[in-house]
Amino acid sequence: MERKTFSQLPLGVSDFHKLRELGKIYVDKTGLLYDLITTFEKVFLARPRRFGKSLLVSTFESLFKYGTRDFKGLAIEKLWKDKTYKVIRLDFSNLKDFSTEEEFSFLLDEYFAILMAQNEITVSKEKSFGGFSSFMYWLGLQPSNSVVVLIDEYDAPLTVCMNNPGLFDFVRKKLSRLYASFKNYEGVIRFLFLTGITKFNKTSIFSELNTLTDISLSPRYGSLLGYTHEEVEEYFKNYLDRSAKALGIGSEQLLDRLVSQYDGFCFEETVREKVFAPWSLLSFFAEPERGFKNYWFESGGRPYALLEYLKSHALRHPEEYGNLKSIALSELTSSSDIKNLSDVALLTQAGYLTLKNIVGTTAYVSYPNEEVKTSMAQL
């Protein structure tokens, strides 16, 4: 019985249909999703790695593609009345294995050719220009308000070449064509959602898609990803009890230690809502007898390309970032040019630093918790 109960952790499951089908625990955020979808049509959300962005994209995909099939018992089940749509899901984490302009062009065409085949998208031979261009041509032919576009890790191919300005600019220009098509054919798109880590400037996302709403620091959606203290106690009570028993400590002492180790991430500008790193918390619950390990940083919070860029530009002494740092709030709310990228802004968007306070137009940031603090000291 215990084995069955504790197999319900959603650790490593980023497919919403699979999560629901297997009976994994799902912290119900669908009330927020409904609010988001019915308020905005084009949305951007920046969050660190391992915070559930891919699961969120998968949740949108299931809702728009299959309606409430996978949402039985969740808040949105009784609220959702919309029809189903053609859903195009783009995962740009598949566009990272390149080191030259030619390799990226080939990778991009190949990716979109596979995407079109998987989605049974065809164009006439005389209009077939390679996967990338053919997809944009197809999009322009679709009926009004008929397509949902979801982009996961939009910035992945850009992050790979942050240390190569020429290649970065080439990739930026290539992807700009795609984002420009979303602007040109916006009447076709019912809902557009982009997610990533960093808000790069001059990628035609934030300049051409001027109707794109950035909710990254919105107080309303500060807990959209990550677990609040209340959610942990409600959805993971059995795991809290089991973990306290495994470590031989009281439940209150356990919660205090979990807060210190894995909580403290703040993604909204009132600085009131704090959330746990979900990957760290779930990993701890899976093996509490191992103690309070540094799960987030080792599993995905340490992207090689990002750290290499920081080390070559500003991140000489990671321990210095343990002190409270000040930064203009506009550096977090506005998109960044790669040539003038602030190390503090980049570290904050990547999750190494988090909001501690905002006074006027100045944000104060520092390490969110002990896990990040100790991991950064080991760089």
Question: Which sequence ranges carry the predicted segments?
Answer:
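Phosphate-binding site recognition
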Residues: M1-L379
